[in-house]
Amino acid sequence: MELVASTQSCSDTVRSDLVKAGLVANCDKSIWIPTQCLDWLGISWDLLNATLTVPQPRVDRLLSVLGVFKDKLPFVTLHLVTSIVGKIISLSPCVGNVSLIMSRFLQSAVFFRHDWDTPLDLSRFQFFPQCLDEVNFWLDNCVKLNCKKLFEYSQPVVIVCTDASDFACGGHAHFVDKEEFDFFYQAFFSMESTLDSNGREMLAILYALRSFKALVRGKVVKLYTDNKNASIISMKGSMSLRLQRQALEIFQFCAMNNVTVEIEWIPRSLNEYADSLSRVVDFNDWSVSTAFFDYIASLFGPFTVDRFASHYSAKCARFYSKFWCPSSEGVDAFSVDWAGENNWLVPPVYLIGRTIFHLEACGARGVLVVPYWPSAVFWQLFFR
């Protein structure tokens, strides 16, 4: 009650000062009684529950205009598209950056120059499928996302640093209250290596989150990158189709794994370890040609799993890798039983001995490919 009385006293003072100054307050728009819930600036402020929401009439108008858009496809006006974009972006105080990421292609459609009110065949637009995906997203999620908690702060639990070079990316992660850390390294596909620096840095962020999936799931993550554009695009999206797709992959990963990520730029001088990881050349990463594999497979195949590979060198649909990479079944081939599989084995030289012992321990079968090296320590293991 003391708080209410104090607030009422402040309200009376302001009202009195306005009158003394010769100003007339608009009584229809003024609230002089303390309240914890009101609609202001197009937003519903609920200080009792500490939430911000978009008023239902605004939500209904957005859903209505989205429905009109779908009904009129493929012929719509830029006036209609602009109306949708404006309504979506106006949700940002309540839904956050998703309003920007999930409206980028609709925004780009606005620049598809045409008469303002003349029906336009949007199916001729390069990003028409993506525009339709964004419309469907807001039809499905507009109501679900319409709430923002006030005064809610969660301190980051996991710190991740990433970087990318011309041929690979790397990064490390650790809990804030622990000294132990984990790291990842991944070589790029030849096509990925041709991307610009923004594209490679975006891949580094995406691959790092996927690699540390078990570590970051359900956590608040602070991720550092030394590329300013990547830090912005990851959170807000891009008009570039390629970069926007990468931003969407990051967004979808976080949504599916309940990860709250804050991406921030830091100078390269503070990102030296991740930078050094991205420049590592893995000389143990070797493989055989497809022609050689096909020949061996014709004699002893088909092989069911490649135990030592990566996404760019795997010879089987199922494979294990040194670090996480796309489609990898696991990151430690020695942690599983090899029995019941026809194993394709092309291990790093320093793991050849362990591979032989693990194959025997599992009672498994497979083909082991090694360099012809009679003076090597592992060579004698074949003649026991």
How would you label these PLM feature ranges?
Residues M1-A21, S44-V54, L91, N229-R242:
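Catalytic palm subdomain of template-directed nucleic-acid polymerases
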Residues M1-A5, L18, S30, P34-W45, ...:
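Catalytic palm active-site di-aspartate
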Residues D39, I43-T51, I88, S92, ...:
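C-terminal functional segments of enzyme domains
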